[in-house]
Amino acid sequence: MFVNIHRNGAMGVPPKCTRQIVHHHTKMGKIMADLFEKKIIFDLECYPSLFVLSALSLETGEMQSFTSPRDAYEYVRANGDALFIGYNSNAYDDHIINFILGVNGECTASDVREISDALINDGIPVRINRFRSYDVYDPIEAGMRSLKMFCGSYGHTTYDSPYSFKDEREYTPAEVKEIVGYCEQDVYYTRDVFNNEFGYYEAACARVPVLQEYGISFDDPRRVVCCRSAALARNVFSAMCTNGRSPKDDARTTIKFAIDYTTREGIGDAYAFYRNIVEKGDELSSKEEFYNKETPTVRLLDGLDVALGWGGAHGAIEGYVKPDDVKILYADVSSMYPTLMIKHDFYPYTFTPHARGLYEFLYHSRLTYKKQGEKLKSQAAKRLIASLTGMLKDKFAVFRSEWSNNSITINGQLSVTDLAYQLSKHFRIVQVNTDGVMAEVKSGEEETFRRIVDEWCVLYKYEVSSHEVKELVQLNVNNYYMVDEEGVTVKGASFSLNRDYFNDKAVCKKALPLSVVRKCDPLEIMKDINDIRDYLILIKTTDTFPYLYDTLSGECTESRCIRCIAAKPNGQLAKLAGVRFVNYVKMRSSKDKSNTQKVSDFPTCAVELPDDLSTYDTDALLALLDKDFYAQKVRTLAQPFQEKKEDARCLFALDLSSVQTSPKPLPYPTDAHTTAFVFDRVRR
């Protein structure tokens, strides 16, 4: 293993870095302990008779492409000290490169294709990495595995190769050049994702000094950057934990309860539900039976139902808007699961004292780093802790202890429901989530709220941050818009503003909570929103309907993601803006125009926009824009709130500038053939 544990040695000193890292087209700020001088963005394509590797040096900006495994082998070997950066490469590209390195490049495109088919059809084998790689997709967890869809959301017009991956024929030089162009396009897209999500890379670098401070060193610290958080946590903790599964690891002996819940009013039935499962459970119990049992619901004194489940406790007033005559206080538990593990001794039996020591070090360090403003270190420690807790159910982890994990989650549910019930004796509960409770508190009742929370904290040994929620628009527990002392928080698809690249009709997500809070028509809100990017509508194809057909021009485009805006049917304004009207439908085949599917929620009149809007007259586009189309969408979405909270009024007007949704325009390669290829290519 590459982990060296020095239990009594001197603590490692985090290396300092004052160097400026400059990426191709993008200047990044200082980063912590960047362990790689050379970074290369790469992508590859595997056809039955053609292999392509394209690689872009971030330091020099040079793009190189190779069409034989041998040439690719020589390039990777010559850059053995570099970090190779791919998109979703952990699942595919890394395995291909490792195969080529393993046979010293002595293979054909057909041999590589066999490995590719095995990866796709038979799953991912255990990989021994022969080079250093970093997957930009892995930490993002965007739920969008397609790179082209991802960058289509950025605003790029994206294309797929017109050549089938099942086509076994030889390609002409012109066709090879075209396929290489597609591969290079994906490299530039990966570059953009890496630059925009650079904080994840910085956090990966921060793992090294965090673990060094505990006395853990590494034979090759650069491998730490390449590891997923889960893999690193598994590696580090496995070296400290006992091996094998104990016969005592069952529900009866492992699931513990933090307090005597029989003394707590209101949650007796929920406790009895779990207690009954535990008393009947053992190692031979069917896990399916254990998890498929219908979990209980607790009704609070104010009538709100809190549903308990293996993922946490949840309850919320649906269609809620904060009134102006009360304040909402939010009791938010800090690091609930680690706190239960440490302060109630819910450690798995596999943890040695040294493993416990590291876990507690990460727990306390994360809080210390956060207070000191060291966000990268705090985030690195947080991810290691979260990964470790989740891996207690991982059948491949040496330290796995499934029932220990259940012990943590069950007590988390019971304890937060207990707090909600105690608060419901005095206050109206607005929301209950996995690690916190929101309640309406009238003026003069704040001390009662804090007293109940403080007593609860002493009982469960929690630390809670209680703060005021200034504004709340809540569709349900999974969809809400909140403004508090930390800024704007959004959750769920209805209000999602937290990922800049998911900006499809972002104006609707901005205007919905603001129009409800201010009790005004969405058009009034939209008068002040004049960034054309907030009005973009993304049209994404599917595997079933992979083509987009414009019924007005009769053209079929290969683009996997097109962006448009709703427009007024005014040809003169369109001409002044330099755009044309489009009406897209999806097609199964580019040759069969009868087999189409309507694009959901597509405006009657629309214009298509490219990724670079800098050459367009913004005033002309705004004059053409049909804001009423978007306002009508918001009116429909706002109906549940207006029906349930017609008397809601706003305490203050929200500052629109506090919500940032539109990404900055991204630079694109200036290489002539690539630029022309990306912007001008419309086939068939």
Feature roles, as predicted:
Residues 4-6, 23-25:
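Intrinsic-disorder-associated, low-complexity terminal segments enriched in Asp/Asn/His/Tyr and depleted
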Residues 27-119, 289-290, 294-301, 305, ...:
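Conserved RNase H-like, two-metal-ion catalytic cores of nucleic-acid enzymes
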Residues 29-34, 45, 153-161, 167-338, ...:
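Conserved "right-hand" nucleotidyltransferase catalytic core of DNA-directed polymerases
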Residues 137, 141-147, 162-170, 174, ...:
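Helical catalytic core of nucleic-acid polymerases
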Residues 261, 294, 303-310, 378, ...:
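C-terminal, non-catalytic extensions of nucleic-acid polymerases
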